[in-house]
């Protein structure tokens, strides 16, 4: 993902890994990729993976993703900390299909929701929960772009993969990054 920003026209020194930027609801947030140009934010990218125990982490990862985006937008709206270009954020998820049994995730005994659940979540696997989340992140503008990659190990030990969300593929992410970098280069001559 870092290389996508560089290939789009940013200098290598302008695209850093694992760096913090200011937050509003918290002091700062460390993003996996932070791209800048002339001291202004071009984009931030969060990269997550789920290799085991999805039941322990799926909801937390989705909640964290929403919070990170809301926090970044709030600090920009209220302080302008990131410069004149506004916030551009992407969320990427690699999910190991081998940990997902493809069985529907059931509610714990006596823990049914009090209100009707969105039909799209019925039935739900952890992989489908991530796919729904990232598709909605993009369509609702929570994130500008994303990438979901589902992986598995084939019987011959090679790695297989698919990109289950048409709006969140490597190619759509690259297209979004290229457009954002072009915008930054034009807006900040």
Regions found by a protein language model. Name each.
Residues 20, 47-52, 94-96:
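An acidic- and aromatic-residue-enriched active-site/binding cleft used to recognize and process polar
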Residues 27, 34-44:
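Active-site beta-strand-loop-beta-strand hairpin of nuclease catalytic cores
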Residues 40-51, 90:
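Glycine-rich, often proline-containing surface loops adjacent to acidic residues and nearby aromatics
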Residues 55-155, 166:
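Acidic, metal/cofactor-coordinating or nucleic-acid-engaging core segments within structured domains
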Residues 150-189:
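A cross-taxonomic marker for long C-terminal extensions/tails that follow the last structured domain
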């Amino acid at each position: 993902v870092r290389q996508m920003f560089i290939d789009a026209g940013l200098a290598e020194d302008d695209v850093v890994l694992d760096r913090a930027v200011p937050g509003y609801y918290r002091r700062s947030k460390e993003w996996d990729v932070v791209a800048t140009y002339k001291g202004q934010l071009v984009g931030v990218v969060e990269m997550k993976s789920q290799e085991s125990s999805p039941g322990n982490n799926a909801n937390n990862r989705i909640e964290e993703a929403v919070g990170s985006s809301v926090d970044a937008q709030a600090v920009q709206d209220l302080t302008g900390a990131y410069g004149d270009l506004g916030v551009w954020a992407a969320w990427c998820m690699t999910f190991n299909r081998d940990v997902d049994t493809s069985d529907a995730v059931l509610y714990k005994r006596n823990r049914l929701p009090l209100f009707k659940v969105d039909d799209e979540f019925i039935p739900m696997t952890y992989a489908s929960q991530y796919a729904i989340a990232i598709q909605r992140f993009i369509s609702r503008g929570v994130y500008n772009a994303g990438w979901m990659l589902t992986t598995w190990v084939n019987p011959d030990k090679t790695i297989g993969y698919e990109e289950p969300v048409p709006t969140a593929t490597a190619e759509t992410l690259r297209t979004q990054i290229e457009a954002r970098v072009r915008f930054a280069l034009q807006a900040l001559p």
